[in-house]
Amino acid sequence: MLRIALATLLSITCIAHVQAEEVNVSGSTSVARVMDVLAEQYNNQNSDSFVAVQGIGSTAGITLLEKGATDIGMSSRFLTVQENNESLEVFPIAYDGLAVVVNLANPVQNVSREQLFDIYKGKITNWKQIGGPDQKIAVVTREASSGTRASFESLLGLTRVINDRTVSDINPTNLVVNSNSMVKTIVNHNPHAIGFISEGSVDRSVKAITFEGVEANTKNISEGKYKLARPFLLLHKKDDIDDDADKFIKYVLSKEGQLLIEEYGYTPVKK
């Protein structure tokens, strides 16, 4: 009897799991960091669906959505003219600052817009040129498909137009890595390094310096004082979103969802 009861319970559990509708959310690794938290909380409260988050980069997420391979896309940059067509619904769920980070031992406390521009263009190559030690600057950036990189370059004017397409215009010798965590790892281990990461990813392994004398924090971002800021976007096809995906989006924009976003270090779109 005990074996029969256990078998029955296992069968019921498996059936319930199979019946749960999966909602796939794909895109920006920066947005995925907070989306993982939102999805976990949502999944705990809703047994009839399961939200799966995949951090693969903004461009890849937008592409998957257009191909119908994901339910919801995530982007940490604005969509390009080519990407933003009438079939997509695009909306912000939060705002995030791009923090400029250096090694903990670096005495530099602030960088101006012009200085940061020149560092990434390769015009400023030594820390002594901005009040630091006589050391060559190791410049770290993100991969070409990164929404974080696209936002950073757009905000600083580090782009140019070729054949009607906006492309990167930074120094090609800058070190390219593929995640916020990798930027932090390199900056933490290299006393000469500088990089940029999502403000919500800043931890004690690196030092975030001020930009134009303003600290990257939720208050300064919400008040518009910190100028290296960008939206976290969700997107879906207007005429092709199922009830489970729509329900999760409403949760993200709900009071509970927005509070989780704020608790995780980002600026919510709703208070």
Predicted regions and their residues:
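Bacterial N-terminal signal peptides
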Residues: 3-14
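Exported/periplasmic ABC-transporter solute-binding proteins
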Residues: 20-271
